[in-house]
């Protein structure tokens, strides 16, 4: 199956499309991924909160994508059937821990044994450890925006439905990314901003949805808290804005 003319395909779930994923994607002419995380079928109780929606992943992969719905049928497929059906005619680029087929029986060595040309891309490191989607999730849960940004290789971007309250301000409902609750310095439509991610405890859950918007998070400012009055909240917002500008 070795043939210099074969196109290369990068394989993986690519959640977040971080620097490690980009190393795998580099030089590949196409990418093979799953629409949903495999654990949503294999072990739903262990399925992680995803960093990027499917649409965002495809945009960030930035090359032709073969997207497979991860179904129970696919989970039961042998490595031989999966490789024959989806990898035939390609040179494969993958990460060190990539596996495929029922119970993960297939990997890079399996493919090489059966004649595939495979390039295993080493882990990309950050502060002495391999970059992974799990590490980025943990950084975001801890409010460590700078660490997440360093591993992603870009600004932390979240997309969500804008919810407008009764003149009290605006908040965002994010369907995917799991962030530490609190107030963030951010950038919206090119302008510096302060964004509250949480439950708006001072005013309660009032509001209506408006079009989806995109926010670039810059740094974590403080925990979310309830204020005794709208005036106290406004004073704190002014202080938050001053910190966001610094």
Region spans (language model):
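N-terminal catalytic cores of NTP/NDP-binding nucleotidyl/phosphoryl-transfer enzymes
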Residues: 2-53
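N-terminal Rossmann-like or analogous alpha/beta NTP/dinucleotide-binding catalytic cores
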Residues: 40-119
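A non-catalytic, amphipathic alpha-helix used as a structural packing/dimerization or gating element
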Residues: 23, 56, 147-154, 232-243
């Amino acid at each position: 199956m070795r043939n210099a003319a074969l196109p290369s395909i990068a394989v993986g779930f690519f959640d977040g499309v971080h620097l490690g994923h980009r190393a795998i994607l580099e030089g590949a002419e196409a990418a093979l991924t799953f629409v949903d995380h495999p654990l949503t079928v294999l072990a739903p109780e262990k399925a992680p909160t995803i960093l990027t929606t499917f649409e965002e992943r495809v945009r960030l992969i930035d090359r032709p994508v073969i997207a497979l719905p991860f179904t129970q049928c696919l989970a039961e497929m042998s490595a031989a059937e999966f490789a024959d059906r989806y990898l035939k005619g390609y040179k494969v680029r993958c990460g060190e821990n990539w596996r495929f087929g029922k119970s993960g029986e297939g990997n890079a060595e399996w493919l090489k044994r059966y004649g595939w040309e495979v390039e295993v891309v080493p882990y990309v490191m950050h502060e002495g450890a391999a970059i992974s989607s799990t590490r980025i999730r943990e950084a975001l849960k801890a409010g460590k925006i700078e660490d997440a940004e360093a591993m992603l290789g870009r600004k932390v971007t979240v997309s969500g439905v804008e919810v407008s309250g009764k003149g009290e301000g605006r908040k965002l409902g994010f369907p995917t990314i799991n962030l530490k609750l609190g107030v963030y310095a951010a950038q919206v439509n090119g302008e510096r901003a302060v964004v509250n991610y949480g439950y708006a405890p001072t005013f309660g859950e009032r509001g209506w949805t408006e079009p989806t918007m995109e926010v670039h998070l810059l740094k974590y400012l403080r925990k979310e808290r309830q204020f005794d009055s709208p005036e106290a909240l406004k004073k704190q917002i002014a202080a938050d804005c001053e910190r966001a500008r610094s």
